[in-house]
């Protein structure tokens, strides 16, 4: 299998897990399969969707809070501490 440095993409479920959005990778896959996650405005139900640096993710938070929009700024090499995970993305706040 190719090392991460040789690829310009990463599986969506693995990136979610490394970015610490969920505790288990299976939970990430189940969340994505719900069809509410969007990559660059395109809905996806595929945990194996390819995620690249610069992609914009739209994630549902809850009915009251609406959505969370983030930009991928790095691909993960491992699941590290929360401080490290926070460096994988940046929040996009609407004016």
For the regions a language model picked out, list residue spans one by one:
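Strongly charged
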Residues: 1-14, 18, 26-30, 38-95
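Glycine-centered, phosphate/nucleic-acid-interacting loop/turn motifs that mediate DNA/RNA or nucleotide
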Residues: 35
């Amino acid at each position: 299998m190719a090392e991460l440095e040789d690829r310009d993409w990463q599986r969506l479920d693995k990136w979610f897990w490394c970015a610490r959005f969920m505790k288990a990778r299976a939970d990430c896959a189940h969340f994505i399969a719900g069809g509410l996650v969007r990559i660059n405005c395109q809905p996806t139900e595929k945990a194996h969707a390819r995620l690249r640096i610069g992609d914009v993710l739209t994630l549902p938070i809850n009915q009251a809070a609406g959505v969370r929009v983030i930009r991928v700024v790095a691909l993960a090499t491992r699941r590290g501490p929360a401080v490290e995970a926070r460096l994988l993305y940046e929040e996009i706040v609407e004016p």
